[in-house]
Structure formats: structure tokens, C-alpha cells
Amino acid sequence: MLTPFNNFFQQRQNYHSSVIDHFENPRNVGSYDKSANDVGTGLVGAPACGDVMKLQIKVENDIIKDAKFRTFGCGSAIASSSLATEWIKGKSISDSLKITNKDIAKKLSLPPVKLHCSMLAEDAIKAAISDYQKKNGL
């Protein structure tokens, strides 16, 4: 039976090594208590392909101290989530908001057909920050 997971490995020659690395060794997988005041949660999805991405941030003094994600989707979606959490850790909220899907896509060398994965990651970052700011009246 062909599953998305197996399909990724059968087509791995079509992916850049950075996508394969983040897919096989995802960074920052996990979650936080979404009700905590220092946690922001972004949940985004792409109905066309079924990818769903949850990205959470833990903030202290306007700095994202930690980030976690859980993604149901293709290898490119998982890699985009993993990279996004790496990039925002240690950054200020304002600097994290400057990360774009183009930055993520370029770093991972995503093909045009997978650009929606990097868009989900950008949207998840923004949604998590927005959630944190709303919780804290910012």
C-alpha cells in the first residue's frame, strides 16, 4: 500500500537534502499547554492537500524562548515546520514576523508545487504570535 510516508521515500531524489534532513530528523516536535499565558498557538491548514500545522511559541520579555510543532502532512510541510521553529527560537516577536514563506522555501529549495508548505509555516508563525499577543493584551 502506498502511503504519503512511503511515497516521500520513493520520491526522495526529488527533494533537497535539507528537506530530507528536517523530515528524517525533525527539530522541536511537541506541544505546550495552550492555555498558558506565555504560550501562543497557531493552527493552520491547507484544505487542498490536507496538511495541518500546529506551531507553538513560548515567549519571555518579547523573545521567543522556545518553539514546538506538530504537523500532519507531507515531508515538505514537516520540514517547513521544523525549520520555522529553529529560526524563531531566540528571536524577538518583531524579527520573527519578518520571516516569510520565500525565506523558508529558499532555504529548503522547495519546488513550486510545494510552496504552499512554506506558506503554512509563515502563517503558523503569525498565528502563534497573534494568539500570544491576544492572550496578553498586546
UniProtKB/Swiss-Prot annotation:
Q: Which cofactor does it need?
A: [2Fe-2S] cluster
PANTHER family registered for this protein in UniProt: IRON-SULFUR CLUSTER ASSEMBLY ENZYME NIFU HOMOLOG
Cellular component aspect of the GO annotation: cytoplasm
Keyword Iron-sulfur belongs to the record: yes
Read off the Pfam families from this record.
Answer: NifU_N
A Gene Ontology biological process term: iron-sulfur cluster assembly
Please provide, alphabetically and separated by semicolons, the GO molecular function terms listed in this UniProt record.
Answer: 2 iron, 2 sulfur cluster binding; iron ion binding
Its principal location?
cytoplasm
**Superkingdom per UniProt:** Eukaryota
Q: Which UniProt keywords apply?
A: 2Fe-2S, Cytoplasm, Iron, Iron-sulfur, Metal-binding
Task: State its location(s).
Answer: Cytoplasm
Gene field: ISU1
> Which InterPro entries does its entry note?
ISCU (IPR011339), NIF_FeS_clus_asmbl_NifU_N (IPR002871)
Listed name of the protein? Iron sulfur cluster assembly protein 1
The subunit field of the Swiss-Prot or TrEMBL record says: Component of the core Fe-S cluster (ISC) assembly machinery.
Which residue ranges does UniProt annotate as crossing the membrane?
A: none
According to its UniProt entry, what is the function of this protein? Scaffold protein for the de novo synthesis of iron-sulfur (Fe-S) clusters within mitosomes, which is required for maturation of both [2Fe-2S] and [4Fe-4S] proteins. First, a [2Fe-2S] cluster is transiently assembled on the scaffold protein ISU1. In a second step, the cluster is released from ISU1, transferred to a glutaredoxin, followed by the formation of [2Fe-2S] proteins, the synthesis of [4Fe-4S] clusters and their target-specific insertion into the recipient apoproteins.
Task: Supply the SUPFAM superfamilies for this chain.
Answer: SufE/NifU
What is the free-text note on the cofactor?
Answer: Binds 1 [2Fe-2S] cluster per subunit.
Q: Which residues form a coiled coil?
A: none
Q: Which Gene3D superfamilies does the protein's record reference? A: 3.90.1010.10
